[in-house]
Amino acid sequence: MSTAMNKFTQTISKPATILNISDSEESGDEAGVGKVSRTTQSSERWLDLLIEKFQPSLQNITRYINWNFIRICNDRLKKEKMGYIEAKQYVEDMAWMVIASEADSIEWKCIRRQEKVTGVKYPKFFFVQHKEDWIECTGCIPYPGHDLIYDEDDDD
């Protein structure tokens, strides 16, 4: 167990590598360590696009994710026995929330259909700025160049 934890700690301690940790428990030498899944690559690319769009306000977002991931591991992995995949998801959710707060002057876009196509899941219940009103839209994150989309046939 300590060997696996040491490998995991080394992996997450490298700058800008948090989103490179695989979501698959079957890949890598130890579960979730080593290989990059297709979903994770997509998630990493979305983060890159958002950072480019919202520069310079988000220039430290990767550093924030790394720092928070280590903090969450320390606080939750040991005390609450949260698995590293759950801890990773929690920190990614936190990062999207930071993006939301940093970019609140930007018009928010829904990428619900993109989420369905890629299989990449994003945090739910973001507040979306649209036509000068704040409205709640399940599954929304900012996505430059896309219109706000509501799928009327969605149950969730």
UniProtKB/Swiss-Prot annotation:
The GO annotation for biological process reads: symbiont-mediated suppression of host cytoplasmic pattern recognition receptor signaling pathway via inhibition of RIG-I activity
Key word S-adenosyl-L-methionine present in the record?
no
Iron-sulfur keyword on record? no
According to its UniProt entry, the function of this protein is described as: Plays a major role in antagonizing the type I IFN-mediated antiviral response. May also inhibit viral transcription and RNA replication.
Q: Which UniProt keywords apply?
A: Apoptosis, Host cytoplasm, Host-virus interaction, Inhibition of host innate immune response by virus, Inhibition of host RIG-I by virus, Inhibition of host RLR pathway by virus, Interferon antiviral system evasion, Viral immunoevasion
Q: Which gene encodes it?
A: 1B
Provenance organism: Murine pneumonia virus (strain 15)
For this record, the Gene Ontology CC terms, alphabetical, are: host cell cytoplasm
List where in the cell it is found.
Answer: Host cytoplasm
Query: Which family does the record assign?
Result: Belongs to the pneumovirus non-structural protein 2 family.
State what protein this is by name: Non-structural protein 2
- Grouped into one coarse class, the protein's main location is host cell
